[in-house]
């Protein structure tokens, strides 16, 4: 988030070229620096989860390091009994939003490949509340695959430099067939294992349950699309 004026100049040039060839295209930054990205050619920027920042305060607020699995989870604002306030988030979010909302969208994400899944510290009901909040705040919400069904974070050994992030990169869980429907290969041939523990959420199970997290997410997104403001 430092001043990177030359990087910004490059992206403004790319934006100019893109507008000529693909005027309908949108550019999305993974910067978490809306004051730079949205004023230099990007339409959107992710509000990334950085340990200790405002977004982390809302959804995770854990302890840990790159080479260790997260611990002391359960301190986030959306954890029912955490006692954590919302001020740290508001103090970070509001000034940046007010400074950039006319330039583009600073977007909430449920997770990404570099972040522990929100289900690591939030119950299903807490996830419903968290999603209801970030899906109705300004910006365009991004749902990381599997978060719509509450896929669990798996504390796996690091794989090719994944470190603690490895546990958020496991295969999508579609149904209750082999490998949860992700692949017909033998389980030991998968790049990362599927969640084999009892109660592993699947799309098939949640589609059939009107009270599932998946159907809550669908309802929230439908609500968002029918309420422009």
Residue ranges and their predicted role:
Residues 96-101:
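Short, conserved catalytic or adaptor-binding loops enriched in Gly and charged residues
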């Amino acid at each position: 988030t430092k001043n990177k004026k030359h990087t910004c100049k490059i992206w403004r040039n790319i934006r100019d070229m893109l507008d000529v060839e693909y005027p309908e295209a949108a550019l999305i930054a993974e910067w978490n620096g809306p004051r730079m990205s949205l004023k230099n050619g990007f339409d959107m920027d992710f509000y990334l989860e950085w340990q200790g920042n405002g977004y982390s305060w809302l959804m995770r607020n854990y302890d840990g390091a790159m080479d260790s699995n997260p611990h002391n989870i359960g301190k986030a604002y959306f954890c029912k009994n955490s006692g954590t306030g919302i001020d740290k988030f508001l103090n970070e979010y509001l000034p940046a939003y007010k400074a950039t909302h006319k330039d583009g969208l600073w977007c909430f994400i449920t997770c990404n490949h570099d972040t522990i899944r929100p289900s690591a510290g939030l119950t299903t009901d807490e996830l419903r509340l968290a999603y209801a909040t970030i899906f109705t705040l300004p910006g365009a919400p991004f749902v990381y695959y599997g978060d719509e069904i509450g896929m669990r974070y798996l504390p796996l050994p690091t794989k090719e430099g994944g470190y603690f992030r490895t546990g958020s990169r496991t295969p999508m869980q579609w149904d209750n067939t082999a490998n949860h429907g992700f692949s017909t290969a033998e389980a030991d041939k998968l790049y990362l294992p599927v969640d084999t523990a009892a109660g592993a959420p699947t799309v098939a199970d949640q589609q059939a349950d009107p009270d599932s997290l998946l159907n809550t997410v669908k309802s929230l997104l439908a609500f968002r699309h029918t309420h422009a403001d």
